């Protein structure tokens, strides 16, 4: 079965009528109808299969899809509706209850207006300080629906693993000034070692959502994280405050320190915790060493991302010299 042709021809019983918009990502095909969107993971993304998760294996792909849906449905049920299977029925193709015998698994979502994507609203100056507080608060409230899993790795060891991944991530992007990046990476590594005794515990570990300005919607005062299931299983757990620092740092880049503080303030209110603010510089550099290269990666298909990547670079310089 050619999944793409089947959806584009409008031949899937139970899906929308007419021809959908076809959105192609590195690892998925998304078919967007007027009210619903249908996401199917690819099996042939060599880079993803070799470096993150081997989706060429059907059993593994189905397992990944199930976990992805369950995770995102719990965090943003307004968007992630249900999981279905795609199967041959008679002479046609239909959405059915998901099972291992299906041709593919399909994540069914309510459609979203991408003009409400947080990155686009930040670029357009459409988010104010009150919004920042509300976003931090709502994000904190949403994370409370997840219980803390049993995690055997210490925060210290996890940060060392993440640091190794980060070095490879940064060095894989030719547009990144490696001399600048090496300075920031050295700071991150030294901080981890200096805090070894404090980090050498599992108590600081928690679930990690792949959440940032590209992976969230802000519409009518509601903050909706999207696509937050990490591509690599090891990244699903980590220092419990990585999540909010990733969100808050993006607001710092575009709006300023007051916005950063407001996001954190709202999160602290919702979760009844106090963040270690003496870690701010470390956490900001950590988050930016993810987002700076990432924006260059995205610029291969969206040229406007170069300006965003350069904005992250200048922000890093400001934090470094501040």
Regions found by a protein language model. Give the residues of each.
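Walker B beta-strand of ABC/ABC-like P-loop ATPase nucleotide-binding domains
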Residues: 225
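ATP/Mg2+ or Mg2+-diphosphate-binding catalytic cores
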Residues: 291-322
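Long amphipathic alpha-helical segments
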Residues: 176-184, 206, 303, 322
């Amino acid at each position: 079965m050619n999944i793409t042709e089947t959806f584009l021809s409008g031949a899937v019983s139970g899906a929308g009528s007419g021809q959908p918009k076809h959105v192609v990502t590195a690892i998925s095909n998304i078919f967007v109808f007027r009210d619903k969107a249908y996401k199917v993971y690819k099996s042939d993304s060599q880079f993803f299969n070799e470096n993150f998760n081997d989706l060429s294996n059907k059993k593994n792909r189905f397992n990944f899809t199930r976990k992805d849906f369950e995770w995102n449905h719990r965090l943003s049920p307004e968007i992630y509706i249900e999981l279905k299977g795609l199967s041959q029925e008679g002479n046609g193709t239909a959405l059915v209850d998901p099972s291992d015998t299906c041709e593919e698994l399909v994540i069914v979502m309510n459609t979203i207006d991408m003009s409400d994507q947080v990155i686009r609203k930040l670029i357009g100056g459409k988010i104010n300080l009150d919004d920042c507080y509300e976003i931090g608060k709502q994000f904190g409230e949403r994370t409370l629906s997840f219980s803390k899993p049993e995690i055997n790795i210490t925060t210290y060891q996890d940060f060392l693993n993440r640091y190794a991944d980060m070095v490879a991530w940064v060095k894989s992007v030719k547009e990144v000034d490696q001399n600048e990046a090496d300075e920031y990476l050295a700071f991150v590594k030294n901080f981890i070692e200096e805090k070894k005794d404090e980090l050498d515990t599992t108590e600081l570990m928690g679930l990690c959502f792949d959440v940032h300005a590209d992976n969230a919607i802000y519409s009518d005062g509601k903050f909706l994280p999207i696509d937050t299931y990490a591509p690599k299983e090891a990244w699903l757990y980590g220092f419990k405050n990585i999540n909010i620092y990733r969100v808050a740092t993006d607001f710092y880049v575009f709006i300023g320190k007051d916005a950063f503080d407001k996001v954190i303030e709202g999160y602290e209110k919702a979760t009844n915790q106090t963040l270690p603010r003496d870690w701010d510089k470390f956490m900001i550099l950590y988050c930016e060493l993810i987002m700076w290269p990432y924006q260059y990666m995205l610029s291969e298909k969206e040229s406007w991302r170069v300006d965003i990547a350069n904005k992250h670079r200048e922000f890093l310089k400001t934090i470094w010299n501040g």
